[in-house]
Amino acid sequence: MPHRRSVGFIETLALVAARPVVALSSLEILAEAEAEAGWPVLAVVDARRGEVFQQRFGPDGAEGPPVVGRPEGVAPGPGDSQPVVVGGDGADRYPEWYGAELRPGREPSAAVMVTLAGQRPAVPGHLVAPVYLRDPDVHINVTTRHTPR
């Protein structure tokens, strides 16, 4: 199910069931699954179109916002002196750009998601908003759409 519909579905379930929700990103879940003492984690998801979604995490959580871009523009460079564990299908797809300690085949884990959710405050479903790293693929031209024929 595409991301935009998934968030709407969860909001609807929360409203109907009168239950709160916990907002987590797949990058956070990947990072937690790869976390090792003292090593930062770079979570990388294949965004298609030759791009990746990625975010760096340290022992205290995210070290910056998630980004989207071509691997050669967002992957760690040779000047990065600190070792990093890289996880996610984006790193698998572009191994030439992610030469760190690579953990192939990782996907967000339901067990890790449940653990993280237990550590976060729950909020009403209508307060959870998706984070979009790029614009939608389709835009409706309202003027054209509502012109009588």
Predicted regions and their residues:
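Short amphipathic alpha-helical face segments that pack within enzyme cores
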Residues: 8, 12, 29, 112-113
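Generic hydrophobic alpha-helical membrane-segment signal
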Residues: 8, 14, 34, 123-125
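DPxDG-like acidic metal-binding loop motif
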Residues: 1-21
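Short, flexible loop segments at boundaries between secondary-structure elements
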Residues: 105-119
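Surface "functional belts" at beta-alpha junctions
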Residues: 19-109, 125-126, 132, 137-148
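A near-ubiquitous, low-amplitude feature marking generic local secondary-structure context
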Residues: 14, 97-100, 116
